[in-house]
A protein has these predicted regions:
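Short acidic/His/Gly/Ser-rich catalytic and metal-binding motifs that mark active-site loops
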Residues: 217-221
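Short pre-catalytic strand/loop immediately N-terminal to key active-site residues, enriched for Gly-Thr
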Residues: 225-233
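Glycine-rich phosphate/pyrophosphate-binding loops
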Residues: 242-262
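Long, well-ordered alpha-helical scaffolding segments within enzyme catalytic domains
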Residues: 234-244
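N-terminal accessory segments that position/regulate proteins before the catalytic core
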Residues: 2-211, 215-216, 234, 257-286
Length: 286
């Protein structure tokens, strides 16, 4: 437990901007404590919840037609692209059957995935389903997964282990390009497992999808609450991926126990405005 003098020492070492950030975290919790007494005792979860869900931290809600256009993909200029095949597998099973069959599976067959399988999974779960007039654009892309304000705060990175015709490495799913953009080359299985203790079974996954939150994409509109919304958005995408993988005959599961800083380093994310939120290893059936 920190002593009072230790806390004061930590605060003294902060810049004025850093001290204001700490104060912003404390104010909502202290107001709740004044109102509710001991029932609002301070703890880490309570501090984060009240700070991030404080209405005062939300930016003024912008009108859909009058706001800036969100950056829908991170810049990866000059990177090589892996185009998707023209013909992709379709989802043909009734939804109720897919819901009944969905399960978290880690027992992958060990054979590689086809590029058409990965392409079909990404496109059916999180591809562009059309366009709409929004954010000063007459053809703003709409995706298959919902998101707060439609700003699409989730980026999907694909760490390729064994996919036919695709070199091992980390890629960004780029629906506008209908393909993958190269981020880093090389076999990254060891790096992923090191960042996710107890997941040696991921070695046999054909690919590992990493869902990352792009906070600035929603922060201009929702303020600090965009951090919470980014988790919701990733959950929507993750569920779509689970259901589409099941329908396509693939095995998939979600992994949330990881070292976020180490994982961000693998993907070249800054770990501040672009943060990893969820891993989803994908593999084939026996």
């Amino acid at each position: 437990m920190s002593r009072p003098d230790e806390l004061e020492s930590m605060l003294d070492g902060l810049s004025a901007r850093d001290r204001e950030a700490v104060a912003a975290m404390l104010r909502p919790a202290l107001r709740a404590r004044e109102r509710d007494g001991d029932r609002a005792a301070l703890d880490v979860v309570g501090l984060a919840h009240r700070a991030l869900n404080n209405p005062e931290t939300m930016a003024a809600k912008a009108e859909v037609q009058g706001a800036q256009t969100p950056r829908v993909l991170p810049e990866r200029a000059g990177r090589a692209a892996v185009p998707f095949p023209g013909e992709l597998p379709k989802l043909t099973h009734p939804l109720q059957d897919v819901l009944a069959a969905r399960a978290s599976r880690r027992d992958f067959a060990g054979r590689g995935l086809g590029l058409d399988e990965i392409a079909g999974l990404l496109t059916r779960a999180y591809g562009i389903r059309g366009t709409m007039a929004a954010y000063n654009s007459p053809d703003f892309p709409a995706r298959y997964a919902p998101s707060a304000g439609g700003v699409q705060s989730t980026d999907v990175y694909v760490v390729v282990n064994d996919v036919d015709g695709v070199a091992p490495g980390a890629y960004l799913y780029a629906p506008q390009d209908d393909g993958l953009r190269l981020v880093n080359r090389g076999d990254m299985r060891r790096l992923l497992v090191d960042a996710c203790p107890g997941t040696e079974w991921m070695y046999s996954a054909g690919a590992v999808l990493v869902l990352a939150g792009a906070l600035e994409r929603g922060r201009w509109k929702y303020g600090d609450r965009a951090y919470c919304f980014a988790h919701f958005d990733a959950g929507f995408v993750g569920e779509n991926l689970c259901l589409c993988a099941t329908s396509l005959g693939l095995r998939i599961c979600a992994v949330a126990g990881f070292d976020a800083d180490r994982l961000a380093g693998v993907l070249g994310l800054d770990g501040k405005q672009d943060i990893p939120l969820l891993l989803m290893p994908v593999g084939s059936r026996a």
